[in-house]
């Protein structure tokens, strides 16, 4: 069965309560449940992982090698700082989609640079939590369908 790994980085465990005017009221468990249901409706298994620790995210990316077809990642603040996550994603050769709930380009200057975007199969920015659904749709249509016949 095709599979997607969904990774959420630092502070995304606070979704639903952290700055709801920016990030909305959907909690991380709700987001993950919705993502799993959408993926399952398309015949795809989705695993989710969240960590506030860079090394744990790197380790989880490494573990995906060989049995994951696509990665959807919201790296949170690590977007702007983590060469390690960039190198891990490049190293496992799994296509990935970078997702951000807010439009990072309309926010503080330091949020405008991503260490991941130039290597991503796609970037989905500013669509709220719907961005995760869009990422799943894209992963199934453009990445997974190239490997599997539906």
Curated annotation (Swiss-Prot):
Site entry: Transition state stabilizer: 18
Q: Which Pfam families match?
A: DHquinase_II
Q: Give a GO molecular function annotation for the protein.
A: 3-dehydroquinate dehydratase activity
Q: Which GO BP annotation is one of this protein's?
A: 3,4-dihydroxybenzoate biosynthetic process
Q: Which InterPro entries does the UniProt entry name for this protein? A: DHquinase_II (IPR001874), DHquinase_II_CS (IPR018509), DHquinase_II_sf (IPR036441)
Q: Could you tell me what reaction this enzyme catalyses?
A: 3-dehydroquinate = 3-dehydroshikimate + H2O
Pathway of action: Aromatic compound metabolism; 3,4-dihydroxybenzoate biosynthesis; 3,4-dihydroxybenzoate from 3-dehydroquinate: step 1/2
Instruction: Name the EC number(s).
Output: 4.2.1.10
| Lyase recorded as keyword | yes
Q: Does the keyword Lyase apply?
A: yes
- Annotated catalytic residues: 23, 100
Amino acids binding substrate: 74, 80, 87, 101-102, 111
Q: Which UniProt keywords apply?
A: Lyase, Quinate metabolism
The role this protein plays is: Is involved in the catabolism of quinate. Allows the utilization of quinate as carbon source via the beta-ketoadipate pathway.
Q: Kindly give the HAMAP family that the UniProt entry links to this protein.
A: AroQ
How it assembles, according to the record, is: Homododecamer. Adopts a ring-like structure, composed of an arrangement of two hexameric rings stacked on top of one another.
| Family the entry assigns | Belongs to the type-II 3-dehydroquinase family.
Protein name as it appears in the record: Catabolic 3-dehydroquinase 2
Q: Per the UniProt entry, what species is this protein from, by scientific name?
A: Neosartorya fischeri (strain ATCC 1020 / DSM 3700 / CBS 544.65 / FGSC A1164 / JCM 1740 / NRRL 181 / WB 181) (Aspergillus fischerianus)
């Amino acid at each position: 069965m095709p599979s997607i790994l969904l990774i959420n980085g630092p502070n995304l465990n606070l979704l639903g309560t952290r700055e709801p005017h920016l990030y909305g009221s959907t909690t991380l468990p709700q987001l993950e449940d919705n993502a799993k249901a959408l993926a399952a409706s398309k015949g795809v298994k989705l695993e989710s992982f969240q960590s506030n620790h860079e090394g744990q995210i790197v380790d989880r990316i490494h573990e995906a090698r060989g049995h994951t077809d696509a990665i959807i990642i919201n790296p949170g603040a690590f977007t702007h700082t983590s060469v390690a996550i960039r190198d891990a994603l490049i190293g496992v050769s799994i296509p990935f989609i970078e997702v951000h709930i807010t439009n990072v380009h309309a926010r503080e200057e330091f949020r405008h640079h991503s260490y991941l975007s130039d290597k991503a199969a796609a970037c989905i920015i500013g669509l709220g939590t719907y961005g995760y659904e869009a990422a799943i749709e894209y992963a199934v249509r453009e990445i997974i369908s190239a490997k599997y016949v539906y």
